[in-house]
């Protein structure tokens, strides 16, 4: 599929965020997707995922939450905010601003939007969804759950992928139980033998092609049901 890609910049409060936007050629409207990066920031791997989702029919925006700031300081602030008050910190505010920008694009159907996040980005996707009802579905990868855990009852549908050889596996198990309890549509899978960052081909010691491709197919199917199939209002 032919794609349109561009670098973008937009406001979040009194600062500017940057990102990489990819969508299929044409006017749309396309379902929108925010791609949230790992602790490494907006890398070429995150741009790859934005392009891959665009090739599947989405208008995808990979945001750089570390724009113009020290990566180490941003990582510390993000993780501290998630641990201490995970539903009210700068990362969530920046993601809301990112979705505002995405929804403002004429090619995007604002009634069909979701998010995918990896590592830190997956944890942020879960926390963000608890605080923003615009999201129709999210796909966290090797993510942790927000506090308090009761916040999970406000989640949208979730398709989560977790490596068996990682501390986040227990978070996936807890999320599965909570979503069952709250009656929220979900598909949580733990991949035995897989390691943290199993979807990142740049992490040669962690990449697991079988887990990466299986999770990709699961995410596409789940998003197809909960995002793409939603009627445009």
Where are these regions (language model features)?
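Serine-hydrolase catalytic machinery in alpha/beta-hydrolase-like enzymes
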Residues: 7-107, 199-203
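Short beta-to-alpha linker loops that shape the active-site pocket of alpha/beta-hydrolase fold enzymes
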Residues: 65-69, 144, 194
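Primarily recognizes the serine-hydrolase "nucleophile elbow" in alpha/beta-hydrolase
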Residues: 96-155
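Conserved serine/cysteine hydrolase catalytic core
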Residues: 146-156, 166, 221-225, 232
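Short beta-strand/loop motif that positions the catalytic acidic residue
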Residues: 159-162
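C-terminal catalytic histidine-bearing segment of alpha/beta-hydrolase fold enzymes
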Residues: 180, 185-233
